Amino acid sequence: MLLLLSAGLWTPGTAQFAGSFNGSAGTDLSGSWSPLPHEESTGNPAIAEYFGVPITEGARAWGLAWDPSRLTLPEHQCQVHVAPYIFGGPLNLRIWEDKDPQSQTVIAIRQYISTYEQNRTIWMDGRSHPSPNAPHTWMGFSTGKWEGGGLTVYTTHLKQGELRRNGLPESDQAALIEHFIRHGDYMTHVSIVNDPVYLTEPFVRTQVFRLVLSEGLNWLYPCESVVEIANRPPGKVPHYLPGENPFVSEFADKHHITVGAALGGAETMYPEFQLKLKKAAVATITPRNTAAANK
């Protein structure tokens, strides 16, 4: 817990990180890993389901303007997921170490992510992050260090991408903190996103991976864009104008909560918000019960 809280205070402007970058002090994470997607269904979330996400008004407006048909555009069909998001979907993950041939200390930890065939480098040699004006990529620029036997990774220089699969955005100013913690044949991946544009507080997620010893995993992602919607006018981008999204209340109605709660914000992350929902439910139900009793 202390590890998460201290890591969550890191901001994108941080150029150096405290602690030793001794590449030989941690648990070996090498191997092929497959996700256990039990924490968040890859088919979720629903449109206008922002409950529990500390988004800004700008992120909410972006999300409500988003139309799922946008994913059918040829330029979006093969668009790579950014590092904070890519671990949440179906993938196979391979991890290995690059070591100095003389000292055998770890210079970098490499990751190959099968989704969109992404190669990621986590530098372990103590180097600084580059200038904010350096190129931004889908995987960003990552440095790592061992903490308590686990690997902590700091990533900047990310392109703008998705925070969740319902249109919530993540800006190119976002920074990612990760903890890779191995427990035998299982590995917990904790990700913490700080985004000064679209988040008011850090957004924390976890995924669990299982070590795969057998062959047969699919490591390729031969994506090729095609025309999915016939006769779409050239240059048309599916979207909703402010106030015109017809699905704003769909998730809220299905789960019997207020639209305001479904639209998220930092307040909705905390247990205290449950009391507010219960009070709202009582206020809604009580008049009906009273009217029925008077008949």
Predicted feature locations:
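PEST-like low-complexity, intrinsically disordered acidic/proline/serine-rich tracts
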Residues: 13-295
